[in-house]
């Protein structure tokens, strides 16, 4: 959430920064609301101060007078009651204004970083580097063709169970998924992350804190009778884990890793990636998450990205690192580095991790602070996939395919999977 004080005092600055996302954001109405809200705050404080003075005066009059029913005392009590009624009325107006302001401000995205490349969409994203040698040759099979031939997963029967864009992993497919999850968790915990296993169901306050609500409600699955949603990413419960807390600065940075199933409606992706493991309604992911001192979040962003990269390097999967332009940034992100893995069947790189620095945007929405330099300060949050499991499996199947139809398992994964190759039964 953006700072309401900044919106109130410098609306032009806010509009100019948001416009870097390639859209026009008119905040004049929000500005008016925040100004009214501040005026009411001042009026309430003034009346409360006068009310305290009056209460003290009433006490003095009672102490001096033998008559507790004097005209002077009754007039003072009447005045005190008028103050209470007026304060109550203003507080009700304040509550209504608070909701109006929140409804508006919660729909404003984060400011893009001044270091992010300026652009309108993904075509303006900036490639920083590549790693590994992309596999380019004829007769490359797609991962879903390989999976079918090796009986690793079934999409058709999953449609019978649920609907399209779900998958059932079978035998070695399930085994490979489990091996990847354990491998990634072990790698990250050895690198200083504390493992959490959060709930898969989250409430609206949690989704609002991380930035999914209210703007993206149509992209998540909601339970019919409860204020609970299927979590679209572990970023949501990990943000909420410290909601409404004042964190000891000595504990910063806090680094979490969490495996979780993720659920997304993919409402805006009809017709895209209809085959395979790339875009499903349910998928598994290992998530990295940092809470850190604001002065150290730029370095933390490099580190969380490097930690995600280390998985791709260990698995010997060719990838590239991309700096996301201002027009393609996620709602809560100020700057994002994407890791895109090479998929030889489509002859292109595909996103497998987004590592984002959200600055104080999520912490402000979730009221997560720390006493830094003797002042309660909103801390910075960062998140990144480390990695998306299904897409990692797809990359292993395609990059490791052999001429005999088998798939070579990356050396680092062999102790977890139990063999060097995936073969037909």
Swiss-Prot record:
This is Serine--tRNA ligase. The keyword Disulfide bond does not apply. Catalyzes the attachment of serine to tRNA(Ser). Is also able to aminoacylate tRNA(Sec) with serine, to form the misacylated tRNA L-seryl-tRNA(Sec), which will be further converted into selenocysteinyl-tRNA(Sec). It comes from Prochlorococcus marinus (strain MIT 9301). One of its GO terms (cellular component) is cytoplasm. Belongs to the class-II aminoacyl-tRNA synthetase family. Type-1 seryl-tRNA synthetase subfamily. Gene3D superfamilies: Bira Bifunctional Protein, Domain 2, Serine-tRNA synthetase, tRNA binding domain. L-serine binds at residues 233-235, 287, 385. Homodimer. The tRNA molecule binds across the dimer.
């Amino acid at each position: 959430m953006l700072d309401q004080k900044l919106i109130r005092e410098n609306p032009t600055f806010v509009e100019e920064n948001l416009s870097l996302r390639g859209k026009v954001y008119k905040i004049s109405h929000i500005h008016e609301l925040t100004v009214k809200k501040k005026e009411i705050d001042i009026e309430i404080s003034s009346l409360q101060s006068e009310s305290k003075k009056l209460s003290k005066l009433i006490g003095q009059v009672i102490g001096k007078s033998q008559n507790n029913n004097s005209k002077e005392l009754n007039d003072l009590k009447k005045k005190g009651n008028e103050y209470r009624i007026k304060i109550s009325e203003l507080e009700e107006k304040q509550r209504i204004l608070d909701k109006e302001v929140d409804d508006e401000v919660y729909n404003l995205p984060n400011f893009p970083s001044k270091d992010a490349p300026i652009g309108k969409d993904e075509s303006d994203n900036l490639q920083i580097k590549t790693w590994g040698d992309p596999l380019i040759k004829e007769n490359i099979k797609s991962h879903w063709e390989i999976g079918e031939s090796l009986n690793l997963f079934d999409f058709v029967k999953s449609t019978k169970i649920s609907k399209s864009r779900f998958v059932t992993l079978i035998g070695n497919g399930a085994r490979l998924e489990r091996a990847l999850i354990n491998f990634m968790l072990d790698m990250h915990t050895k690198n200083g992350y504390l493992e959490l296993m959060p709930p898969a169901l989250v409430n609206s306050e949690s989704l609002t804190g991380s930035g999914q609500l209210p703007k993206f409600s149509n992209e998540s699955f909601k339970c019919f009778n409860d204020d609970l949603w299927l979590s679209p990413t572990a970023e949501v419960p990990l943000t909420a884990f410290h909601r409404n807390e004042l964190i000891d600065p000595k504990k910063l940075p806090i680094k979490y890793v969490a495996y979780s199933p993720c659920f997304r409606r993919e409402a805006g992706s009809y017709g895209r990636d209809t085959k395979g493991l790339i875009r499903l309604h349910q998928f598994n992911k290992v998530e990295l998450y940092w809470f850190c001192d604001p002065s150290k979040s730029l370095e933390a962003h490099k580190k969380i990205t490097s930690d995600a990269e280390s998985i791709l390097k260990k698995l010997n999967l060719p990838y590239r690192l991309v700096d996301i332009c201002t027009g393609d940034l996620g709602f809560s992100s100020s700057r994002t580095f994407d890791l895109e893995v090479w998929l030889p069947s489509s002859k292109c790189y595909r996103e497998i991790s987004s590592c984002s620095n959200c600055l104080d945007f999520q912490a402000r929405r979730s009221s997560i602070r720390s006493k830094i330099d003797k002042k309660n300060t909103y801390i910075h949050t960062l998140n990144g996939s480390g990695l998306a499991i299904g897409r990692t499996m797809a990359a292993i199947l395609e990059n490791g395919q052999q001429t005999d139809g088998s798939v070579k398992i990356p050396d680092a994964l062999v102790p977890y999977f139990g063999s060097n190759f995936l073969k037909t039964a």
